[in-house]
Regions:
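TRNA-recognition modules of translation machinery and tRNA-sensing kinases, especially anticodon-binding
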Residues: 19-319
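Extended amphipathic alpha-helical scaffolds
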Residues: 6-25
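Short, small-residue-biased leader/transition segments that mark boundaries at the very start
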Residues: 1-3
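Short, flexible active-site-proximal loops enriched in glycine and acidic residues
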Residues: 5-6, 48
Length: 319
């Protein structure tokens, strides 16, 4: 399914919608994100390469604590907005995988457990939407607004591949997600609310962002509409993707049998609409956070919302 309002051949024809916050352009050189982490003795890529290969990392000390703090803050941020918090299964059956994504996406992303009908999830959206497989939901129980934490596992087969030294594109990371199951007439409004939640989250941490509408040629299979949320990189002096918001219409619901019972006519059943959006994926968020809060002396300011999760720390200083 592909019905974006914006027609185009590929991601080069995506269109910026709106910017939020003024991009920071410091008068000093911003180091590569791994170099910043290493200055705090906060990452070990060499050890991860020995144990697991490229696309993995050891985080430690204050950087590991910052990573966990961002996730904890994201959890509470979404709970405060009325979403129900979940920790879902991290492995799902093949019929759920085929219900939430196309075969091509599955081949490029999913790790299969040898000898079992189980796949490691690439995002908690997979298991959260799968939660509703073969269900009939009364109209008055909708919308279901859920926020879920999980590790995510991705093969990352394709044009971009894995970074040898970095945490932008990797095989394993953690993420806080939003998922909504709603009536068809409500999905457009929920789409707007979901991407706005991510924008508000990043702005609460003083990170400039923009939204980018994905054209028809850049839409993954099953998606009706999608936009990327991109954060500003002072080092690269450009925006980079930190999350994606998608309206799947009734595509996943049809594949998985997620139906709604009409309140006015209980004999009438129709398919729900499903949506998902990234609240935050800390590896990429760490890049944006460290670059945008870096000071010339190498220290990193910790914004007020994160300080309670960091034991009251107001800054990170070099080891």
């Amino acid at each position: 399914m592909c019905s974006s309002d914006l027609i185009g051949k590929d991601d080069s024809e995506n269109v910026e919608n709106e910017r939020f916050g003024e991009p920071v352009v410091p008068d000093f050189e911003v180091p590569y994100h791994v170099d910043i982490m290493e200055s705090f003795d906060g990452i070990d890529l060499d050890a991860a390469r020995r144990t697991s290969g490229n696309g993995f990392y050891y985080l430690k000390g204050d950087i590991a604590r910052l990573h966990s703090s961002i996730l904890s803050y994201a959890r509470d941020f979404m709970i405060d907005r009325g979403f129900t918090y979940y920790i879902p299964p991290f492995m799902i059956h093949g019929d759920v995988v085929k219900g939430v994504m196309s075969f091509k996406e599955m081949e490029n992303m999913m790790y299969k457990i040898e000898g079992e009908d189980l796949y490691l999830i690439g995002t908690s959206e997979h298991s959260m939407i799968g939660k509703f497989i073969d269900t009939i939901n009364d109209e008055e129980t909708l919308p279901q607004t859920l926020t879920s934490y999980s590790p995510c596992f991705r093969k990352e087969v394709g044009a971009h591949g894995i970074e040898e030294r970095g945490v932008y594109r990797i095989h394993q990371f953690e993420k806080q997600e939003m998922v909504v199951v709603c009536k068809p007439e409500d999905s457009k409004a929920w789409y707007e609310k979901l991407w706005q939640n991510t924008v508000d989250f990043f702005r609460s941490l003083d990170i400039p962002v923009r939204t980018l509408e994905c054209c028809s040629g850049d839409l993954a299979d099953l998606k009706v509409k999608s936009c990327d949320v991109e954060a500003w990189s002072p080092r690269q002096k450009k925006y980079f993707e930190v999350g994606s918001c998608s309206n799947l219409g009734d595509a996943q619901a049809r594949r998985l049998g997620i139906r709604v019972r009409s309140k006015e006519n209980p004999k009438e059943l129709y398919f729900a609409h499903t949506l998902n959006n990234t609240v935050v994926a800390p590896p990429r968020m760490l890049i944006a956070f460290l670059e945008n809060n870096l000071r010339e002396d190498g220290s990193v300011a910790i914004p007020k919302p994160l300080q309670p999760y960091m034991g009251g720390m107001t800054e990170l200083r070099k080891k």
